[in-house]
């Protein structure tokens, strides 16, 4: 009988869980605040979110969005909390899912490719905390905004995340909503290719 990997191989230390949950709560809170301000068009928080809100509310807009799952999900709660709040919460939840999925796969890879189970408890705690910090670093660094005419790692990323109205790196809710699925596809493709 095959063991459930979540119950055995992917167990994390208490300190690792607490660190992850604390940072997840903090990160999600900050992202929800950002998306909320964007959806309610608070000055200083310009983004494309008003167009997403209009789509959720059923108002015809100037843009076609290629990713309907985001809007279907937002509409589930829009009747209860309104289109603006629903869009903010839905975007934050997809972002939260992406972090959790990344943490799961990073834990899986670390445990598969290292000798985690034979490490001392202290080293396991440090490994769990480092993996958690790497996950959040990936999410924050993946949205870097580079000023115009500058190169980052030798590539010109001028206005890489410009969006329609703003250099806000979290402007594109469609991109944020696809990340959980893209992360799963990435890790599962790596798994298939490594076993092929």
Where are these regions (language model features)?
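Membrane-interface micro-motifs in multi-pass membrane enzymes
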Residues: 124-187
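Start-transfer (signal-anchor) and selected internal transmembrane alpha helices
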Residues: 1-33, 120-133
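Loop-to-helix entry region of an early transmembrane alpha helix in multi-pass inner-membrane enzymes
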Residues: 81-101, 105, 120-132, 171-176
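Short hydrophobic/aromatic helix or loop-helix immediately within or flanking a transmembrane segment
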Residues: 51-85
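Helix-to-loop transition at the C-terminal end of transmembrane segments
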Residues: 32-48, 144-150
């Amino acid at each position: 009988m095959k063991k459930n990997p979540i119950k055995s191989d992917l167990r994390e230390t208490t300190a690792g869980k607490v660190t992850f949950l604390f940072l997840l709560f903090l990160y999600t809170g900050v992202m929800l605040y950002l998306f909320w301000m964007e959806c309610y068009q608070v000055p200083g928080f310009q983004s494309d979110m008003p167009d997403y809100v209009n789509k959720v509310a059923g108002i015809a807009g100037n843009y076609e969005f290629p990713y309907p799952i985001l809007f279907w999900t937002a509409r589930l709660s829009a009747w209860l909390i309104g289109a603006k709040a629903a869009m903010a919460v839905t975007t934050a939840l997809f972002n939260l899912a992406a972090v959790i999925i990344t943490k799961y796969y990073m834990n899986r890879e670390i445990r598969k490719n290292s000798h985690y189970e034979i490490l001392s408890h202290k080293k396991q705690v440090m490994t769990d905390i480092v993996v958690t910090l790497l996950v959040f670093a990936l999410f924050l660094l993946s949205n870097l905004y580079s000023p115009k005419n500058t190169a980052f790692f030798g590539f010109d990323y001028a206005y890489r995340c410009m969006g329609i109205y703003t250099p806000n790196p979290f402007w594109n809710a469609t991109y944020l909503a696809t990340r959980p699925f893209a992360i799963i596809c990435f890790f599962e493709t790596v798994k298939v290719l490594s076993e092929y």
